From Swiss-Prot:
Ni(2+) binds at residues 76, 87, 89, 95. This is Putative nickel-responsive regulator. It comes from Desulfotalea psychrophila (strain LSv54 / DSM 12343). One of its GO terms (biological process) is response to nickel cation. Its cofactor is Ni(2+).
Amino acid sequence: MLKRFSISLDDNLLEIFDQHIAEKAYNNRSEAIRDLIRKNFVLKEWEEDRDVMGVISLIYDHHQSQLQKKVTDLQHDFHHHIVSTTHVHMDHDNCLEVIIVKGRAGDVIELADGLAALKGVRDSNLAMNSTGKSLH
């Protein structure tokens, strides 16, 4: 059941918010507000070290000595948090590794930080998601 409430914003903030709505192609302000609220609660789950889901992506030089072994070893150290991995050969030199993870936020962050710190990793990202349990 939806509940209606109102908020007050100054003109400048409302203008910025309406630009955001247009850029993201929301149908209305309510959808945009709901999305912002959900994102805030997902962030809170991570801050409170709750059970979360996430996606770690890495781009690395596969010619870097021992890097693939280090990536694999670190994943094995956190095997109980890894749901799935996908490895893509981007070109002759670069690989993309996508790792779907689940577990306590602190453990997931530790894995992501460990992978990002490896010599030869050119780019890394952790997309922080929720398990969905608290977003009804």
